[in-house]
Amino acid sequence: MSLCLRLLCSVCGAAALRVPLGVSSLRALSGSAEGFRPARVAVVAKTTRYEFEQQRYRSSGLSEAELRDLLALKGSSYNGLLQRYNIHSENVEHIVQSLRKEGTDVRLVKRRDYDEETVRWADAIISAGGDGTMLLAASKVQDRFKPVIGVNTDPERSEGHLCLPVRYTWSFPEALQKLYRGEFRWQWRQRIRLYLEGTGINLTPVDLHEQQLSLEQHNKAHNSQLEQKSVAVSGPQLLPVRALNEVFIGESLSSRVNYKSCKPRFTFSLHRASYYEISVDDGPWEKQKSSGLNVCTGTGSKAWSYNINKMSSQSVEELLNIVRQHKSLNVSLDSDVIQRVTNAYNDSLVYNPEEPKMFFSVREPIANRVFSSSQQRGFTSKVCVRSRCWDACMVVDGGTSFEFNDGAIVSIVMDDQDALCTVLLDD
């Protein structure tokens, strides 16, 4: 109930929570009242599954016919992947040509070519893909006055929560005209920053989207930095990434057991709980074992965090039946009531992306006489975690990973200067 009330209060006060723009900020962005017409735009296009499969087997010298046969063996449709690629490519071209017709200087880049220099060059960034591409585009933007706009290039296959409404996929010039006329408002999506300290830490990030890397190669990417590790650092180090959706902390490869015999070595992967200590809002430290810890923003409250915490109508019905038995409540539990209660609870898990607060969730906590979980989820302004793990990672927006093993300490906070500038077009 308290969670519902907090969300109700936050919704009622949403307008007051918008980050204010000063005079210099308005001048830097040419505020929405004046319209926004960027001279240079970087369009970041996603890598489709078809392109990925081509890149993956290019080194093997496979022809298109051989690739088609290989995909069929894997249960994938070559024609289907090619069709989605063509749809995406046509919509990307629609975006690029619409911008160029307006005299905008456009730079079209893929994931591997998207870097800090491209971000500095551009007045605005457009992600052409889905939510994953939007997260990628946002990941390299540190300037809170550089807008990032998402366009869903394949609405049939991508939800696109972070993108413009679907109709602008095919009518992008209409979206541009609304920007030029100032028919929109800036939306400042709060992001999470991370301070890492402790012993044996590694500040080198690994890009998890480099899908050409095998699992073994991924480990080598981490281990190749061992020589650069410091046994301890003098103080907290601010990591060079910001989380738009969430930060997840947990064991990555569980436990691995190698067996040697006359046969080739093989590996078993068994589940290992994540062991850590946690402090919420500078409160007392608490030892926990769980399947990991998720800390999200208002933007991320609709994503993984929502699916971790949401309740099914079946669970709600069972709980209400127990309450009715113990409290002698004379309440009709028809399907409509159950569904309304379910929706009310699940809706309370989602909050405004502009609110400067986080929501943490402990996944499947273990509770016994040694380990406890006094609070499994809740809103917070600061979370500190001390790792007691052996093979753990701290993953930012599902795309960037940092080692987070025994002795490492992370402080998870928000800062207004990290807010990501996006737009909400007027209806």
Swiss-Prot record:
Gene3D superfamilies: Probable inorganic polyphosphate/atp-NAD kinase, domain 1, Probable inorganic polyphosphate/atp-NAD kinase, domain 2
A GO MF term: ATP binding
Coiled coil stretches, renumbered: none
Feature: transit peptide: 1-33
Keywords linked to the UniProt accession: ATP-binding, Kinase, Mitochondrion, NAD, NADP, Nucleotide-binding, Transferase, Transit peptide
The keyword DNA repair is assigned to this record: no
GO biological process terms, semicolon-separated: NAD metabolic process; NADP biosynthetic process
Disulfide bonds: none
Superkingdom of origin: Eukaryota
Catalytic activity: NAD(+) + ATP = ADP + NADP(+) + H(+)
Example of a GO cellular component annotation carried by this entry: mitochondrion
Listed EC numbers: 2.7.1.23
Subcellular locations according to the entry: Mitochondrion
Pfam families referenced in this protein's UniProt entry, alphabetically: NAD_kinase
SUPFAM superfamilies reported in the protein's UniProt record: NAD kinase/diacylglycerol kinase-like
UniProt-listed PANTHER family: NAD KINASE 2, MITOCHONDRIAL, PTHR13158
Quaternary organization: Homodimer.
Main function: Mitochondrial NAD(+) kinase that phosphorylates NAD(+) to yield NADP(+). Can use both ATP or inorganic polyphosphate as the phosphoryl donor.
Sequence similarity: Belongs to the NAD kinase family.
Protein name (record): NAD kinase 2, mitochondrial
